[in-house]
């Protein structure tokens, strides 16, 4: 009961008490008058990260996507009409509370929402409690590098990026010299599977029975950090009414290097099998595994990476360049479906037997940003991506072996205001 009381105090009491506000604080920041070690026992903040998401689709078939998701490019589509849209659904509202116990240890609690839940509906982003060694709740998945994010206007990011938020139980600590941080977590398994248009394996969703296990080691220095992480998964699928499972695993290497002028270089490399649920351009599409001609389900191999560089021309004027790619493949598939039409002979929903399928998503952008005053950033960005597929097998009693690709271009713009 005492623990529940502490959580309630951390989240809500700071918003009800009258306290002193400080320069550079958020919309509402309050501190208790009682202190410990010259720090307030209780501190609370209410903040808003306002984001205007404007975009003009030049071509490529992503008119219905509010992010520049290369995985959603319809490679057999022909609609290259332009589209202009704006929204503020990516605006975030958060409440944060810090409570210092009598022994000097601090407890932090965060609740954060945005309006990206479909048609402007509110969506929970984060809700967690953190102590000196534990973090429990929903936050960034430990397989990804929480500190990384290229400074871009469109918030899908590179196709191989890992920016997944899941409920988890995480334990972390430091070695004696504090240069190395270790992290272990139990992550909620991902079970949202939606068939994508280009390929539709006859695999159904099944209840998961085990958490995803992650481990990470981070090396911190004044210039930035390097991080290595790994994941082990048990993924269950239902094939032809029968439940089966397989092991998935993956590894990432990531890091950031920054200078005193705030110029920075970021990168992330990823590879593994059965981890497509974590790759941003294909996450949630049920591509972790596929049925083979042997009647078994095999983990999907995939790999990718991205790099970004941000350069400050002046303290207020800066630019970013980002490149990234993702590659995954299905070998010796029992069957899959090509929707829309084949490149030469138009046939709707072609069933392909005993074949292979692979896809590459390539991504690049360049932007310029300006900060007219404190807490305000405006920018414009050119986004470009290519989705290519290779496929072969037997269709309509004939051998097919072909490939197709389609590119897309978007101009993103908007502002970010932190209140």
What spans do the regions from the language model cover?
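Cleavable N-terminal export/targeting peptides
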Residues: 1-31
């Amino acid at each position: 009961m005492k623990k529940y009381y502490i959580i309630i105090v951390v989240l809500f009491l700071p918003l009800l008490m009258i306290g002193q506000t400080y320069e550079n604080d958020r919309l509402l920041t309050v501190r208790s008058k009682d202190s410990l070690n010259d720090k307030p026992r209780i501190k609370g903040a209410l903040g808003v990260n306002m984001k205007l998401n404007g975009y003009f689709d030049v071509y490529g078939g992503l008119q219905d996507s509010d992010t520049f998701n290369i995985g959603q490019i319809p490679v057999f589509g022909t609609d290259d009409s332009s589209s202009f849209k704006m929204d503020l659904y990516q605006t975030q509202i958060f409440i944060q509370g810090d409570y210092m116990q009598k022994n000097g240890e601090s407890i932090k609690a965060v609740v954060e929402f945005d309006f990206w839940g479909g048609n402007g509906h509110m969506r929970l982003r984060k809700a967690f409690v953190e102590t000196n060694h534990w973090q429990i709740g929903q936050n960034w998945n430990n397989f990804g590098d929480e500190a990384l994010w290229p400074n871009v206007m469109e918030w899908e990011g590179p196709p191989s990026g890992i920016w997944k938020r899941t409920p988890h139980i995480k334990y972390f600590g430091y070695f004696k010299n504090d240069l190395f941080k270790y992290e272990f977590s139990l992550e909620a398994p991902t079970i949202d599977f939606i068939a994508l248009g280009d390929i539709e394996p006859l695999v159904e969703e099944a209840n998961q029975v085990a958490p995803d296990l992650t481990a990470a080691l981070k090396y911190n220095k004044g210039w930035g950090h390097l991080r290595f992480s790994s994941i082990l998964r048990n993924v269950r699928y239902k094939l032809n009414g029968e439940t089966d499972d397989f092991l998935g695993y993956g590894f990432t290497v990531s890091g950031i290097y920054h200078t005193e002028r705030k110029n920075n270089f970021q990168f992330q490399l990823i590879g593994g099998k059965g981890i497509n649920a974590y790759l941003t351009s294909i996450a949630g599409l049920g591509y972790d595994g596929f049925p083979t001609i042997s009647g078994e389900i095999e983990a999907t191999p995939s790999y990718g990476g991205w790099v970004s560089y941000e350069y400050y021309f002046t303290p207020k004027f800066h630019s970013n360049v980002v490149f990234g790619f993702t590659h995954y493949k299905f070998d010796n598939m029992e069957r899959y479906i090509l929707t829309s039409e084949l490149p030469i002979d138009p046939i709707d929903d072609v069933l392909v037997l005993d074949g292979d399928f692979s896809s590459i998503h390539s991504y690049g952008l360049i932007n310029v940003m300006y900060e007219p005053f404190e807490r305000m950033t405006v920018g414009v960005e050119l986004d470009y991506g290519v989705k290519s597929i290779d496929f072969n097998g037997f269709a309509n009693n004939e051998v097919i072996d072909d490939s197709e690709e389609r590119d897309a271009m978007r101009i993103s713009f908007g502002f970010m205001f932190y209140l």
